[in-house]
């Protein structure tokens, strides 16, 4: 396990003591000692899967599944146009359609070395920046994707 995950585990333990079992942990077996924390972020009537990826690199990132149902190939050009606009307007995130499953994802990359890593920054970013942003744009994305 990596140093960032050790710090995140302490935060998760504190959250669990308070009754918040937001995250489950998955340890990977790779050269970067990757640990993925699975959670959910509520946006309107949707509970969006969230993956916080901590590894032995200069970055940490959060991936949010904007859709959990594959979008139709026919709407992908319109969706990509909408996502490109969002990518230009909101610099903190990157939206894309995965070629693996045709779902829409949002990645938020955070530079942070082991020594400076603060897990509360990750959680606060999700709750205070990403969640309000998704409240503003999620319905429009689903509409363009033909899922609303």
Task: Name these PLM-found stretches.
Residues 1-51:
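Charge-rich, low-complexity N-terminal segments
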Residues 39-69:
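Long, continuous compositionally biased terminal/linker segments
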Residues 112-128:
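A short acidic/glycine-rich loop-to-helix N-cap element
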Residues 62-103:
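Short, internal acidic amphipathic alpha-helical interface segments
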Residues 104-108:
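Short, aliphatic-rich beta-strand segments
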Residues 128-137:
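Amphipathic, Lys/Arg-enriched alpha-helical patches that create a basic surface
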């Amino acid at each position: 396990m990596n140093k960032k995950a050790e710090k995140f585990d302490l935060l998760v333990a504190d959250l669990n003591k308070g009754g918040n079992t937001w995250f489950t942990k998955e340890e990977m077996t790779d050269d970067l000692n990757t640990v993925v924390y699975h959670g959910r972020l509520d946006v309107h009537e949707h509970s969006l899967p969230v993956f916080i990826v901590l590894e032995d690199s200069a970055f940490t990132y959060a991936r949010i599944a904007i859709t959990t149902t594959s979008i139709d190939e026919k709407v992908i050009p319109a969706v990509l146009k909408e996502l490109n606009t969002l990518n230009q307007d909101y610099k903190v995130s990157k939206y894309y359609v995965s070629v693996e499953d045709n779902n829409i994802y949002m990645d938020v990359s955070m530079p942070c070395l082991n020594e400076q890593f603060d897990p509360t920054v990750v959680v606060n970013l999700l709750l205070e920046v990403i969640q309000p942003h998704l409240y503003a744009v999620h319905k429009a994305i689903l509409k363009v994707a033909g899922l609303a």
